């Protein structure tokens, strides 16, 4: 259960060599350090006892700091060690401001001194020094400057390798790379809601578990109102106010312990805020919400029998009001199970640096950039347009942190965004019928006034019938001879003539007679 960035830090400090013997020796040292210094939550009492017995002890743990204005001092909280209100100097807090922003993982020099009192209370735990394992400061301006030295493709590969993927490996083509980047958008866009359903072992939860300490991976059925939103007794805001992203793993099982969590989640997914009786009133949060799960059937089979939300928990899988708040449906079935060759051995950003980069990008926004070059089609309603803009914004943040991009870049991301939101809308149409009839998503180039429609790869019918509005005089129908059924395309055009009917395209007298009878019927009844 050791976070990846903790391992990276220790390995980098002991195994930075090409000498195989020294690497093996370094790995053994890392194992010893973790065994002696890394704190598992169940060992908290033992660690406190060691501090008392030895007077001083060095640990690897997550530390956060809060200000106590009544006493005009700072208190440190050591998470896994379950140490509350440890003494810490103002200078240490000033040197590491992220201690006040949710905390950081660090190597912590602790001391136990039973003579330290505040008023009549004893506060024996003291933080003497910390050596951050995560970055305690981060400069986004340097990222923007360094980005200029990379092409777009080079930067994309760097991002993917930093996340652990090898973009040049078999099976990770351009399409899959774009989908893997989409997994990062909830980490750079606040209050972004996404669903990914797909096969097992395709890394759906990996990003949120291993790549960033700012995401919470929640097992199915563990979500409670107090844990997610607010504790009415204490007034403490829950996970939506503490994390950048919350990923519900195995969302095909039960999602929430409390039945009233669903309406609260609807409110939160819509506006980023919620209200609940008791303390707090209207409460806001910034956490993005991700629902991951497995599909146990081919997607074609699911679409034949139901809809693509059907594998999700029965709490929400037919709730159109809930599902309409999903910004993007990532087609996880396109991402196959990863082989060892799909994981990179090349250089990328260290995990702590990469997680800070993703967190820093949340402050930017490119929400309006679509309007510089394109208009959205008439079928996109408010929630559709909002979702599409946020997906485009996320891709620009990831691939163009310096803010330099072209119209072609925006169009590329816009097509992906329209597809991801259209997939949501198509399932809503299957569930809710004509309330969600407007699914022909398109965009209009402001320069050429050309309208481009975006379809879904899994909708096989698009190969037979155009997935765009048909031209006047064109329609499709089904016909059969009793044994076979086929699709026919009918085109009607008006051309100058002499008023006589001419039938072409068939030698069947029966068909010709049927057409003549139809024409005569229309003439007789047209008035």
Question: Which residues does each predicted region cover?
Answer:
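Flexible glycine-/small-residue-rich
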Residues: 249-250, 291-293, 330-332, 491-496, ...
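Helical mechanochemical/support elements of P-loop NTPase systems and associated helical scaffolds
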Residues: 151, 155, 257, 261, ...
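C-terminal helical "lid" subdomain and adjoining coupling/linker elements of P-loop NTPases
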Residues: 340-342, 368-443, 450-467
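Extended, charged/polar low-complexity intrinsically disordered regions
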Residues: 1-166
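Conserved ASCE/P-loop NTPase catalytic core
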Residues: 166-301, 306-310, 321-324, 444-458
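Conserved P-loop NTPase/AAA+ ATPase motor core
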Residues: 456-527
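Conserved, well-folded catalytic cores of nucleic-acid-processing
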Residues: 162-166, 268-272, 295, 329-333, ...
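Phosphate-sensing "switch" segment of ASCE/P-loop ATPases
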Residues: 281-289, 294-399
């Amino acid at each position: 259960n050791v976070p990846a960035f903790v391992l990276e830090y220790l390995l980098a400090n002991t195994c930075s060599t090409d000498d195989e013997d020294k690497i093996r020796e370094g790995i053994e040292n890392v194992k010893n350090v973790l065994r002696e210094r890394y704190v598992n939550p169940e060992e908290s009492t033992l660690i406190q006892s060691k501090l008392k017995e030895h007077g001083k002890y060095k640990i690897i743990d997550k530390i956060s700091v809060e200000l106590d204005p009544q006493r005009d001092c700072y208190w440190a909280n050591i998470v896994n060690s379950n140490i509350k209100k440890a003494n810490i100097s103002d200078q240490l807090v000033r040197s590491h401001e992220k201690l006040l922003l949710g905390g950081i993982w660090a190597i912590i020099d602790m001391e136990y001194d039973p003579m330290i009192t505040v008023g009549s209370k004893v506060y024996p735990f003291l933080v003497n020094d910390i050596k951050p394992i995560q970055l305690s400061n981060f400069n986004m301006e340097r990222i923007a400057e360094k980005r200029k030295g990379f092409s777009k493709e080079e930067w994309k590969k760097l991002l993917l390798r930093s996340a652990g993927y090898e973009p040049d490996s078999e099976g990770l083509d351009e399409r899959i790379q774009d989908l893997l980047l989409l997994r990062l958008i909830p980490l750079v866009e606040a209050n972004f809601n996404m669903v990914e359903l797909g096969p097992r072992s395709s890394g759906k939860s990996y990003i949120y578990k291993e790549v960033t300490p700012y995401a919470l991976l929640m097992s199915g059925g563990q979500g409670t109102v107090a844990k997610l939103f607010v504790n009415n007794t204490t007034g403490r805001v829950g996970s939506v106010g503490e994390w950048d992203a919350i990923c519900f793993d195995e969302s095909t099982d039960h999602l929430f312990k409390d039945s009233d969590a669903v309406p609260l989640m609807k409110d939160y997914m819509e506006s980023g805020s919620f209200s609940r009786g008791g303390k707090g009133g209207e409460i806001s949060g910034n956490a993005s919400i991700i629902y991951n799960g497995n599909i146990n059937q081919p997607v074609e089979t699911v679409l034949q029998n139901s809809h693509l939300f059907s594998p999700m928990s029965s709490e929400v899988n037919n709730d159109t009001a809930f599902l309409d708040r999903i910004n993007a449906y990532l087609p996880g079935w396109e991402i196959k199970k990863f082989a060892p060759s799909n994981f990179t051995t090349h250089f990328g950003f260290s995990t702590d640096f990469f997680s800070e980069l993703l967190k820093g990008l949340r402050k930017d926004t490119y929400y309006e950039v679509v309007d510089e070059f394109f208009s959205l089609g008439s079928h996109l309603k408010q929630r559709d347009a909002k979702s599409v803009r946020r997906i485009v914004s996320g891709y620009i943040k990831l691939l163009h942190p310096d803010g330099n991009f072209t119209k072609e870049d925006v169009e590329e991301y816009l097509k992906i965004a329209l597809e991801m939101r259209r997939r949501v809308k198509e399932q809503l149409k299957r569930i809710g019928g004509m309330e969600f009839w407007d699914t022909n998503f398109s965009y209009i180039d402001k320069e050429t006034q050309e309208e481009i429609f975006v379809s879904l790869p899994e909708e096989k019918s698009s190969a037979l019938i155009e997935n765009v509005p048909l031209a006047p005089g064109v329609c499709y129908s089904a016909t059969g001879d009793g044994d076979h059924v086929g699709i026919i395309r009918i085109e009607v055009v008006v051309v100058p003539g002499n008023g006589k009917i001419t039938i072409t395209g068939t030698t069947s007298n029966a068909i010709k007679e049927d057409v003549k009878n139809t024409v005569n019927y229309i003439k007789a009844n047209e008035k």
